[in-house]
Swiss-Prot record:
Protein name: Mitochondrial aspartate-glutamate transporter AGC1
Superkingdom as given in the UniProt entry: Eukaryota
Keyword Metal-binding included in the entry's annotation: no
GO CC annotation terms, alphabetical: mitochondrial inner membrane
Pfam families xrefs: Mito_carr (PF00153)
Family classification: Belongs to the mitochondrial carrier (TC 2.A.29) family.
GO biological process: aspartate transmembrane transport; L-glutamate transmembrane transport; malate-aspartate shuttle
Upper taxonomic lineage: Eukaryota, Fungi, Dikarya, Ascomycota, Saccharomycotina
Its job: Calcium-dependent mitochondrial aspartate and glutamate carrier. Transport of glutamate in mitochondria is required for mitochondrial transamination reactions and ornithine synthesis. Plays also a role in malate-aspartate NADH shuttle, which is critical for growth on acetate and fatty acids.
Membrane topology term: Multi-pass membrane protein
């Protein structure tokens, strides 16, 4: 754990956030105010001119931390509701010495606690421990601090005074100002829990120490006993006698109120408006009379939403659903029950769901979908009708955000509107619970209709003509999809959608970014691998290249009748060594040639790719042509030296043959001479690459079904498949560009005595056609095909194999600082490449699972060691408090003030 004085990238970011929200204390204010004016601090402590976080400052910081980063959001779009006031509990817990504000040391302590796995339980414990510590200080002994980083520390060693714990909860209840809760006495009385005695213990076995409970016991109580106690209390306080059946029942409005009270922080808000008990054929109840059995079934479902979410995901996986299937394939209650009860590979071995409970689940999902349809078809003209704000979110997801330009102002405005709409929905749905419970028309409450995409409504219209005044429950029930269920059982559904889009956008931007060191290193890395791969390919086929050059250099067929005859004569006269004459310049030249060609082609393909990552055929041709043009600058000088050395036995006398080497050729030609035939070289290499690379890509895609961006296709090919792809692509490219290769070779060698001298490309073409015929333009063509095809096959196969064997190193922002472009708020945006953020994303998928969906349930956390997800973790802490007592949802400043005063009174109490 880092100290507050540690100077790291993370600490600097933490300090920047603190300074952005902290309130500077005035220099003339030597003592803090004793009042609570506008979130002020409590008196008694000497103040300096340091910056501090007041209550409202801290709550604003946590609430606004969702937008700290411009590239991704921190759970902005979760469908459950976490009141911002609960963050005041964290403020109270981490305020050392009950100062009434947080200084920078408190802030760093909070950041350190968030690093622990069980940070939410630690903060919950610290909240109640403050009162125990205050009592102990009043008696005299000092209170020891706890090192939560100690791996030997057990939650059984952390305990609380049970009587003080209960007194703290009673203090919370005394602060509640909700008339409905107060009038109906919806307070958990811990003194009435008969099972509590089984959790308590006495430190050191001494009765005078009083009963205590450990943190482990408290967690067990929250996870088990309190759930039942809340339901019993709620039903007992609100139920009334139904004279028809002589049984106790509650109304739908009362049920919804209890659901909001107990689970609004954990389940999607859409559920509250999707209850309609009159549609339950298997339960003898209606919206005015809901019996205890249905009441418990509903909360049983809610408590097991996580398992249900995993079941529907497993259903999609077993049936090999694609993302589209998840949205469109229908599922019935019988289908789901049959799947859950399958004997082999059973999912729910411990938790069981009855048919009545599954019917209740489908009723909720059906009502939600029906309300969505009615809201979208409210008027006769859907295009001009009013849509709820949440339908705008759906339009944004499926249109603007996916296809928008991240760098454009229009995109930024759309994203801001998206955020505003979402906030309005949350605020509208949260409402005043008192007013909602007394309202007779619950349909007037704003409905979460957001998450059915427009094509689903079109799908409804195509399947069945339905009037706008209603939908058949049976019809909607039959038309439910897995996605419909996911929207109900998973409060992170929308956030997961947005998160995947953000990951794809970060990945897309990282490919084209040229402002950071990593892309530069990436090019050097590709250049090196391309060089080595090119040398391997050149050495394998160099003898064929020798035959090709000799055949193209001769102006008649007096010496070599064909390629085979040429090969045999070279072997007989010059030996095997003669086949590799000029190999040195070839290896020197092939390294930059192949490396430049491969690197430029990769760069151009990434630059010209569309938003969906695909490349049109003209763009593929442009990419290949650009790569071929760039290589000529480096390779033409070395190629002319190679050719001179390859034909020296035919054009140089025996006495002078040994004196001809690469250095002598360079001295003889000079700088300008080294670029002789460069124009013909361009005419050869540009069309060659323009033909080769698109052909290579299409053979891999169409013949071998290769597409790493498509989960339904292969993301890796075998070596032989790479060789075949490269070899087949090289054949048409090599043969069709042979005439330009012949012209280039003729221009780059000196003619023998009596042979015509060429004055440029067109003169050479006319002379060859006139003196030798059109057939001479394809001299060495078979040898060129045999050389180029396997050479590029070996080169590209080696290039891709090296990429797999020697992956590029990944950089972390903690070791390599990169400049930022557009700081947002207190933090700069993310500038890392996707490989640095998400190394797991680069690992190949195991197996051939068709439903390797990137739309549901992302398992990637975009927070590295340098980025901080305050909002998500603070929400987890808030859930822990609300699970313990739902009244923590109203821990506003007035409540905090009473807790602060009570704690100070305990400290100052004299015994």
């Amino acid at each position: 754990m880092e100290l507050s004085s540690a100077s790291t990238v993370k600490k600097k970011r933490q300090l920047a956030i603190f300074n952005a929200y902290a309130t500077p204390l005035r220099q003339d204010e030597r003592r803090l105010r004793a009042s609570y004016e506008h979130g002020g601090v409590v008196g008694g402590h000497v103040a300096s001119n340091e910056k501090v976080l007041l209550f409202d400052d801290f709550v604003d910081l946590i609430s606004n931390s969702r937008s700290f980063y411009s590239k991704f959001t921190d759970h902005c779009f979760n469908l459950n509701q976490i009141p911002n006031t609960v963050f005041g509990c964290i403020f109270f817990a981490i305020d050392e010495n009950n100062k009434g504000y947080l200084n920078v040391n408190d802030w760093f302590y909070f950041n350190n606690v968030l690093e622990y796995d069980n940070y939410h339980f630690i903060i919950l414990y610290e909240f109640f421990r403050k009162f125990d510590a205050a009592r102990e200080r009043a008696y005299g002994p000092s209170v020891k601090s706890i090192n939560y980083g100690n791996r030997f520390l057990s939650f059984d060693e952390l305990y609380l005074d049970l009587e003080q714990f209960q007194a703290t909860l009673r203090l919370l209840h005394s602060c509640v100002r909700d008339d409905f809760i107060v009038n109906n006495k919806l307070f958990l009385d811990w003194k009435q829990f008969r099972w509590l005695k089984w959790y308590q213990f006495y430190p050191r076995g001494l009765l005078q120490n009083g009963p205590h409970i450990t943190l482990n016991s408290l967690i067990s109580i929250v996870q088990n006993d309190l759930k039942s106690e809340k339901l019993l209390l709620g039903f007992h306080c609100l139920s009334q006698l139904d004279h028809r059946t002589n049984s106790m029942t509650i109304s739908k409005n009362q049920l919804v109120y209890l659901m909001r009270l107990f689970y609004s922080h954990k389940i999607p808000a859409d559920i509250f408006n999707s209850l309609n008990m009159s549609t339950l054929s298997c339960a003898k109840c209606d919206n005015n009379h809901i019996n205890y059995n249905v009441f418990r079934d509903l909360f049983y479902l809610i408590q097991n939403f996580d398992l249900l979410n995993q079941i529907v995901h497993r259903y999609a996986e077993v049936h090999k659903f694609s993302d589209r299937d998840v949205r469109e394939q229908h599922i019935s209650r019988k289908d789901l029950l049959r799947f859950m009860n399958t004997e082999y590979n059973k999912i729910n071995n411990i938790i069981e769901f009855s048919p009545a409970q599954i019917s209740l689940l489908f009723s909720i999902v059906t009502n939600s979908k029906k309300l969505n349809y009615l809201n979208n078809a409210r008027q006769n003209n859907p295009e001009l009708s009013y849509h709820h704000r949440d339908s705008e979110i759906d339009s944004f997801i499926h249109n603007e955000y996916i296809n928008g330009n991240a760098a454009s102002s229009l995109h930024n405005e759309s994203l801001e509107k998206f955020n505003d709409d979402f906030e309005n929905i949350i605020q509208a749905d949260a409402g005043d619970t008192k007013q909602q419970i007394s309202s007779t028309d619950w349909r007037s409450v704003f409905s979460w209709s957001s998450f059915l995409s427009s094509f689903e409504w079109l799908h409804f219209k195509k399947r069945k003509s339905v009037q706008t005044n209603g939908l058949s429950d049976e019809y909607v029930n039959e038309a439910l999809t897995l996605e419909d269920i996911m929207k109900i059982v998973n409060p992170n559904y929308l956030n997961d959608l947005v998160h995947h889009m953000e990951l794809r956008r970060i990945e897309s931007e990282s490919r084209s970014s040229n402002l950071y060191f990593y892309p530069i290193f990436d090019s050097i890395y590709n250049f090196t691998l391309g060089s080595v791969a090119g040398c391997i390919g050149a050495m394998v086929v160099y003898p064929i290249d020798m035959v090709k050059t000799r055949m193209q250099a001769q102006r008649d067929f007096s010496k070599y009748k064909n390629s085979i005859d040429c090969l045999l004569k070279i072997l007989s006269k010059e030996g095997v060594r003669g086949l590799y004459s000029g190999l040195g310049p070839q290896l020197i030249g092939v390294a930059p040639e192949k490396a430049i060609k491969l690197t430029v082609n990769d760069h151009m393909r990434a630059t010209l790719a569309g938003r969906d990552g695909k490349l049109s055929l003209p763009c593929e041709i442009i990419s290949g042509a650009t790569a071929g043009a760039c290589q000529v600058v480096f390779t033409n000088p070395l190629e002319i030296v190679k050719i001179r050395l390859q034909v020296k036995s035919d054009y140089v006398a025996d006495a002078a043959r040994n004196s001809v080497n690469a250095i002598s050729v360079i001295k003889n030609l000079g700088l300008i001479g080294l670029y002789r035939g460069a124009g013909a070289c361009l005419l050869r290499d540009i069309p060659f690459s323009a033909i080769y690379f698109p052909t290579y890509a299409h053979i891999k895609s169409n013949v071998f079904n290769f597409d790493p961006k498509d989960s339904d296709k292969r993301n890796k090919l075998n070596t032989w498949q790479l060789l075949v792809s490269g070899g087949l692509a090289g054949m048409p490219a090599a043969f069709l560009t042979t005439p330009f290769d012949v012209i280039k070779t003729r221009l780059q060698i000196d003619p023998k005595k009596g042979e015509s001298v060429y004055n440029g490309i067109w003169d050479a073409a006319r002379t060859i056609l006139k003196e030798e015929g059109i057939k001479s333009f394809f001299k060495g063509g078979p040898a060129r095909v045999l050389r180029s095809s396997p050479q590029f096959g070996f080169t590209l196969a080696a290039y891709e194999i090296f990429h797999n064997l020697f992956p590029a190193p990944r950089y972390d922002d903690s070791t390599t600082h990169r400049p930022t472009r557009e700081p947002v708020g207190a933090l700069a945006p993310i500038n890392k490449t996707v490989s640095a953020f998400f190394p797991d994303q680069l690992e190949p998928h195991v197996g051939n699972n068709k439903w390797a969906s990137r739309l549901y349930g992302p398992n990637i956390d975009p927070y590295s060691s340098s980025f901080l997800n305050y909002y998500y973790k603070s929400c987890q802490v808030a859930k822990a408090f609300m699970d313990l007592d739902y009244n923590f949802a109203h821990f506003d400043f007035n409540t905090y003030q009473q807790f602060h005063d009570e704690l100070n009174a305990m400290k100052n109490k004299k015994h």
